Amino acid sequence: DRQYRKRSCDVQMTVILASTSPTRQLLLTNAGVSFATARPDVDENRLRSANPQWRPDDVAPALAQAKALAVSGLRPDALVLGADQTLICDHRIYAKPLDVADARKQLAALRGRSHTLHSALCCARNGSVVWRHDARAELTMRDWSPAFLDQYIAKLGGDILTTVGGYKVEELG
């Protein structure tokens, strides 16, 4: 019989979340991770425009990496976590809504339809990628009435503009 001993590690590493997203911060907090936050200097729209060859599945991993590397360049001593999520329906990538009218339009386009949420994570240290992961979730939005949509938008308020597709699966749905 082999005996295993737990080893303690005295190495302390600063973890930085390359995002100011309250949802991402809550996920790390709930996981018991001590971290700081930094807003990455990444223009997502410019990156997308500069890379027309990107397929829908390329976008979230590329943006997560860009965010992690941008902050890692400023804090090479830290482990930097970059994240991104895209919503894909019928080969179209949905971005965060520009305004409430755009959110209403996006939600109407998803009504009663299946779509994919593609989430990507990237860790960087010393300006290099040390780990990455991405996953997809297939979801179907239920059919709903115009009155329901009005109530939903009223309940979410400004939060409707902070997430792709205009909905938060981790909250109201």
Predicted regions and their residues:
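Short, glycine/serine-rich, charged loops/turns that create anion-binding
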Residues: 22, 42, 128
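Anionic-ligand binding patches
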Residues: 13-16, 29, 53-173
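Short, acidic/turn-prone active-site loops that include or flank metal/cofactor-
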Residues: 39-45
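N-terminal G-site helix/loop of the GST-like fold
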Residues: 16-39
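Short, basic/glycine-rich phosphate-binding loops at helix/coil junctions
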Residues: 45-48, 85-87
